[in-house]
Amino acid sequence: MKKVFALFCILLMALGCSGRQDRYVQISGYAQGGTYTVKLNMKGIGVPVETIRDSVEALLTQIDTTLSGYNRKSLVARFNAGERVPATPLFLEMYALARHYWERSGGLVDCAAGPIFDAWGFGFKNSRFPTEEGISSLLGGMGHLPETLPQEQGMVDPAALGNPCLNYNAIAQGYSCDVIARYLYGIGVKDMLVDIGEIWCDGVNPSGKPWAVGIDRPIDQAEEPSDELDGIWTSEGKPCGVVTSGNYRKFYKKDGRKYAHTINPKTGFPVSHNLLSATVISAGSAAEADAVATWCMVLGLEEAQALLLDSPGLEGYLIFEGEDGEMKEWASPGFTLRK
């Protein structure tokens, strides 16, 4: 996550020809190293658009100054540097969420694996290709995180935890969507789409139809979503988080071998399997979709399929490389993609 720039575009979309008395607003800007968009139906909302815009900006700034490992002045960056930091609600909530998914995944989604990600160059430091001895040393130094953070006079001391290095990238963007959506629900918004790299949507779009989301086709080193979509997924008007995780944007090659940014925290090494991307739909939260998508990418195809089939409230779409080298797809029973 990077600094939030106060650049917004507000568009009012009148729907006179549809017969609906809706008034949609779009707020766009820059956050977390990319662009974001918030679309919402202002029908029945007594809060001015400008206030909503300012509130969204303030929340994104708060997330950046609390949780961004790229912002050296953020609470998590200061914590990772060994500094005692205030136990703010956002800091505590993210830690609790991250630890929950660490426990639920059996350690495969691990916020304390920051040193491993840094060592491979996929974290907050410019490193690359560590030795096996170096990885073993890092794994040995990764401690067990308690269920709750110990506090003293409203402060959290990393030394009391063995000075862990936290990296929330596996759920940060999904969590950010949830924070913005929580604010919108609080002011009475029913129809919304929050897109901060990951997505939370609910209700219908300006045309009165359920929100539709394009699913990327995995193309190596595509820095931005490509124009080539694998298909369109439609929400059916129900609230849900939508997240795609994959190894086709962040990786590097050495001696002819591809090293992807998905790392197994238990082995300390990038995964090597035929699963190219995992799209997860969660009825609960975008943070859950984010965490489970990462979890799937660590597991690989067969175990990811089993996870999605055995998880109520989750649907998934997996793109993988078949034995013939061609891309193939698998979808859980409740996931419908329109090609």
Predicted feature locations:
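Mature catalytic core of soluble alpha/beta enzymes
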Residues: 4-8, 15-339
